[in-house]
Curated annotation (Swiss-Prot):
Protein name, entry field: UPF0173 metal-dependent hydrolase OB2186
Pfam assignment, any one: Lactamase_B_2
Domain of life: Bacteria
Keyword match Ubl conjugation: no
Gene Ontology molecular-function annotations: hydrolase activity
UniProt cross-references to InterPro entries, sorted A to Z: Metallo-B-lactamas, RibonucZ/Hydroxyglut_hydro, UPF0173, UPF0173_UPF0282_UlaG_hydrolase
Length: 226
């Protein structure tokens, strides 16, 4: 299984049978090396409804007839727009043909600004625990620090965790060090930073502070084999 990072919170997972993208914010994400028009994927996972996470979901899903998994209210909205979306809620898990998804708690907001300017309620934000062939990826989503992250680390043997460090909209670097320690993943990767001036951070400096497992600031487009 190959896992790659593409700026902001965009993560791709590729197995022998499936191509999965999480929070595909491509256009408007200057760090991203992907092209929404040509991206090939059959599964899209969304942590919440903010535009910098839903991103190019509509274009990608329509081009690929992709299957979407998202928090309940967001999934219902996407389904109403003609997309193939499966709703889940916090604490729920489900086994799909591509792997098992469990939604975890996240402390954040969730709304989508449509093209006409209307604001769509997106339900509760989430983190995503994705387990495939015995390997577990934890995309923490956008969140503040909260102590249940330690519980998730105790309950699950996490191979790689993607943790926001940008501050202002999510936890900052100091809190994210605590999060990495509690989650206790083999590899902790910083995300949600340097996309906008207000979330500029030194990812390598953050990674060097991680004492539990390995902190690692992935380069854009870099691939890790799990």
């Amino acid at each position: 299984m190959k896992v790659s990072y593409h700026g902001h919170s965009v993560v791709q997972v590729e197995t022998e049978t499936h191509k999965i993208v999480i929070d595909p914010f491509i256009n408007g994400n200057d760090a991203c090396d992907l092209n929404a028009s040509t991206l090939e994927t059959d599964v899209i996972l969304l942590t919440h409804a903010h535009n910098d996470h839903v991103g190019d979901t509509f274009e990608i899903a329509k081009n690929n007839d992709a299957f979407i998994v998202a928090p309940n209210e967001l999934a219902n909205y996407l389904s109403a727009q003609g997309l193939n979306a499966h709703p889940m809620h916090i604490g729920g898990s489900r086994k799909f043909d591509f792997g098992t998804v469990k939604l975890t708690q996240a402390f954040h907001g969730s709304s989508y600004v449509a093209e006409d300017g209307s604001v769509i309620y997106g339900g509760m934000p989430a983190g995503i625990l994705l387990t495939i062939d015995g390997k577990t990826i934890y995309h923490v989503g956008d969140t503040a620090l909260f102590t249940d992250l330690k519980m998730y680390g105790e309950m699950h043997d996490i191979d790689i965790a993607f943790i926001p460090i940008g501050d202002n909209f999510t936890m900052g670097p100091e809190d994210a060090v605590y999060a990495a320690d509690w989650i206790n993943a083999n590899i902790s990767v910083p995300v949600h930073y340097n996309t906008f001036p207000v979330i500029e951070q030194d990812a390598k400096a953050w990674a060097n502070q991680i004492k539990t497992g390995k902190g690692y600031a992935m380069n854009i487009g870099e691939v890790i084999d799990l």
